[in-house]
Amino acid sequence: MAITVRRSTMVRPAAERPRERLWNSNLDLVVPRFHTPSVYFYRRPDAGAGAGPGAAEGFFDAERMRRALAEALVPFYPMAGRLARDEDGRVEIDCSGEGVLFVEARAPGAAVDDYGDFAPTMELKRLIPAVDYSGDISSFPLLVLQVTYFKCGGVSLGVGMQHHVADGMSGLHFINSWSDLCRGAQIAVMPFIDRTLLRARDPPTPSYTHVEYQPAPAMLSSAPQALTGKPTLAPTAVDIFKLTRSELGRLRAQLPTGEGAPRFSTYAVLAAHVWRCVSLARGLPAEQPTKLYCATDGRHRLQPPLPEGYFGNVIFTATPLAEAGKVTGAVADGAAVIQGALDRMSDDYCRSALDYLETQPDLSALVRGAHTFRCPNLGLTSWVRLPIHDADFGWGRPVFMGPGGIAYEGLAFVLPSANKDGSLSIAISLQAEHMEKFRKLIADV
């Protein structure tokens, strides 16, 4: 699909403020160093969709969006800055007000429907501006945006947000606040911009082992050669799978019931199903250790809770670890392992994690990447509780929002339905051979 860029603008905050440097917590520094990609799709409202009079007027007017963006960057001023290093080499944010990239593009030969179920393939990634990382860390904007207009009248909004600046909750806080301003509303919750609340204790006193920061298990030497060979040589595939409300209900029906039966969250049950299917698709031996990475928002796990609107990264990681034979059996067995790891994520555990990171000589060594999630391991990040469908710029809510790409084999996302029908979707990257088997297994509930 041909995409033509019509205009690129660096949008600066609508009002200047004194330049400052923003200290990053340890949680801001152990995240991947690229821009997190996501894409929104919007259909042009019409009478048939039940839209009110004038709903399509000025549909995604670029000038209106730029003005609102400049206004949003005033309270969210770190977003308009650049990365920098302090005298010790620690990455921080230079709140320089240099602006964010806003691109207008057209895809005259494409329609929203051409993207099918919105699997995060390379076609979706083309809807987000590419970032040149070849220069110094101060050389690129922290936020890149692209509005692409399709022949059907629909629009996509591609977002690339540098992960040191914000996690999913904070990133959506910004995007949704921008959309509120564009719609003529006010920002509901102002950002809280002070990351020192997540400083480690002095002196740091970690009280747990923190397996989440230990190296991921490797394939056992006794495993089949197809699994122990160089993983970088295996082609990967990306796909998305929908589980309906009734299918999710059938998953729950597999759990024990009655007095004294364990209680599992929806995430634990679904994650157990995905972990089981991935392990079976990969053909893992029963004795093979496998680790599941579960991103966990610490905003309300910390006590006292962080202020509403805290802007930054507050993602801790629960990491259930088990032998494959444990997770390829009954769903309840895997769910018990997962729920146990999630239940351990208390204030005490999270504070200990901050202290543990403070004691590490090189935080960059703990940044997760391809080596973390590849076979035999898995990352499963849930966006179910995030307000991913709230970005109404004045022309209606998105019909889809999800990742604009999946960087690593073995990484997956859980997405809620835009129409609130109770279904959940799994976007995942696996080795192509394993994906064929996973496709059959995931639907077998």
Swiss-Prot record:
Induction: Induced by the crown rust fungus Puccinia coronata. Its EC number is 2.3.1.302. GO terms for biological process: defense response. Gene3D superfamilies: Chloramphenicol acetyltransferase-like domain. GO terms for molecular function: acyltransferase activity, transferring groups other than amino-acyl groups. It holds the Pfam family Transferase. SUPFAM superfamilies: CoA-dependent acyltransferases. The keyword Acyltransferase applies. InterPro entries: CAT-like_dom_sf, Plant_Fungal_Acyltransferase. Keywords: Acyltransferase, Plant defense, Transferase. It catalyses: 5-hydroxyanthranilate + (E)-4-coumaroyl-CoA = avenanthramide A + CoA; 5-hydroxyanthranilate + (E)-caffeoyl-CoA = avenanthramide C + CoA. The keyword Nucleus does not apply. PANTHER family: SHIKIMATE O-HYDROXYCINNAMOYLTRANSFERASE, TRICHOTHECENE 3-O-ACETYLTRANSFERASE. Involved in the biosynthesis of avenanthramide phytoalexins, which are phenolic alkaloids found mainly in oats. Catalyzes the N-acylation of 5-hydroxyanthranilate with 4-coumaroyl-CoA or caffeoyl-CoA as acyl donors, forming avenanthramide A and avenanthramide C, respectively. Does not accept feruloyl-CoA as a substrate. Belongs to the plant acyltransferase family. This is Hydroxycinnamoyl-CoA:5-hydroxyanthranilate N-hydroxycinnamoyltransferase HHT4.
